[in-house]
Curated annotation (Swiss-Prot):
<dbReference type="InterPro" id="IPR036291">
    <property type="entry name" value="NAD(P)-bd_dom_sf"/>
</dbReference>
<keyword id="KW-0752">Steroid biosynthesis</keyword>
<dbReference type="Pfam" id="PF00106">
    <property type="entry name" value="adh_short"/>
</dbReference>
<dbReference type="GO" id="GO:0005783">
    <property type="term" value="C:endoplasmic reticulum"/>
</dbReference>
<feature type="binding site">
    <location>
        <position position="181"/>
    </location>
    <ligand>
        <name>substrate</name>
    </ligand>
</feature>
<comment type="pathway">
    <text>Steroid metabolism.</text>
</comment>
<keyword id="KW-0560">Oxidoreductase</keyword>
<feature type="binding site">
    <location>
        <begin position="44"/>
        <end position="73"/>
    </location>
    <ligand>
        <name>NADP(+)</name>
    </ligand>
</feature>
<keyword id="KW-0444">Lipid biosynthesis</keyword>
<dbReference type="GO" id="GO:0006702">
    <property type="term" value="P:androgen biosynthetic process"/>
</dbReference>
<dbReference type="InterPro" id="IPR002347">
    <property type="entry name" value="SDR_fam"/>
</dbReference>
<comment type="function">
    <text>Catalyzes the conversion of 17-oxosteroids to 17beta-hydroxysteroids. Favors the reduction of androstenedione to testosterone. Testosterone is the key androgen driving male development and function. Uses NADPH while the two other EDH17B enzymes use NADH.</text>
</comment>
<keyword id="KW-0443">Lipid metabolism</keyword>
<keyword id="KW-0521">NADP</keyword>
<dbReference type="GO" id="GO:0004303">
    <property type="term" value="F:estradiol 17-beta-dehydrogenase [NAD(P)+] activity"/>
</dbReference>
<dbReference type="GO" id="GO:0047045">
    <property type="term" value="F:testosterone 17-beta-dehydrogenase (NADP+) activity"/>
</dbReference>
<dbReference type="GO" id="GO:0061370">
    <property type="term" value="P:testosterone biosynthetic process"/>
</dbReference>
Length: 305
């Protein structure tokens, strides 16, 4: 029995050490060492960003163009894409291609493939995603768009990765950033379908990272918490980053490993949340809090925007 306790203690200590090392890496890269633009450019001439019309996707489009890459913007609303493309070309001098596609549909990928033919794609950002309901709610109370969410949050990641990864493999270099969520790190009741879809992105990305790391391809999953975007409607503060703030910081960590929260503030949030015992996190009291006070907080955010 004594040996069992010693082994358990050593295991817990090892886990804590790994987490401390990961946090220290983020801390060092956040304040001491910036990733040179030449690294991102060395991946290839073009970056492809899904969900580029708003929020995080739009921010990645501008930031990667500022780093010297040409960008392919893929999203549903043509007018938004045209406006963003014009501004990127005017402010950065990078070339921009736009592809109108609705990721809630399955029949779009041949169309996307045609627009990507012949491009040296070095970076793919699988960002597009949707919430079934903005407010926390029980599964049967959501609007019934479950299939749309599966296509948008899961199918898009698989299909876009298939389109781009084989060319990266032949060139033996590339970077794929899959935007998951902190809600992927443990099941989140009242956001059950969204949490499950992001958990797929998390596990899929981690497995792919192992499969292709020896072929010169970096595959990293990002698990942010609160980001102020048109989809989330959060107000930004010290812990809630704007899309621009999050993207600029996240690009510092692309060489850190297969997983990152994307910013130092969210690494801290993850450490705190992961210390909450399941019996508390999944208690009736916690669920009532989400349904009442957290919903009220979200409503205040909307009214104050």
């Amino acid at each position: 029995m004594e040996k069992l306790f010693i082994a358990a203690g050593l295991f817990v200590g090892l886990v804590c050490l790994v987490k401390c090392m990961r946090f220290s890496q983020h801390l060092f890269l956040r304040f001491c060492k910036a990733l040179p633009s030449s690294f991102l450019r060395s991946m290839g001439q073009w970056a492809v960003i899904t969900g580029a019309g708003d929020g995080i996707g739009k921010a990645y489009s501008f930031e990667l163009a500022r780093h010297g890459l040409n960008v392919v913007l893929i999203s549903r609303t043509l007018e938004k894409l045209q406006t963003i493309a014009e501004e990127i070309e005017r402010t950065t001098g990078s070339c921009v291609k736009i592809v109108q596609a609705d990721f809630t549909r399955e029949d779009i990928y041949d169309h996307i493939k045609e627009h990507l033919e012949g491009l040296e794609i070095g970076i793919l950002v699988n960002n597009v995603g949707m919430l079934p309901s903005f407010f926390p709610s029980h599964f049967l109370s959501t609007s019934g768009e479950s299939q749309n969410l599966i296509h948008c949050n899961i199918t898009s990641v698989v299909k876009m990765t298939q389109l781009v990864l084989k060319h990266m493999e032949s060139r033996r270099k590339g970077l794929i950033l899959n935007i998951s969520s902190g809600a992927a790190l443990r099941p989140w009741p009242l956001y059950s379908l969204y949490s499950a879809s992001k958990a797929f992105v998390y596990t899929f990305s981690k497995a792919l990272s192992v499969e292709y790391r020896d072929k010169g391809i970096i595959i990293q999953v990002l698990t942010p918490y609160s980001i102020s975007t048109p989809m989330t409607k959060y107000l930004n503060n010290k812990m809630t980053k704007t899309a621009d703030e999050f993207v600029k910081e996240s690009l510092k960590y692309v060489t850190i490993g297969a997983e990152s929260c994307g910013c130092l503030a969210h690494e801290i949030i993850a450490i705190i949340l992961n210390r909450i015992p399941s019996r508390i996190f999944y208690s009736s009291t916690a669920q009532r809090f989400l349904l009442t006070r957290y919903s009220d907080y979200l409503k205040r955010n909307i009214s104050n925007r």
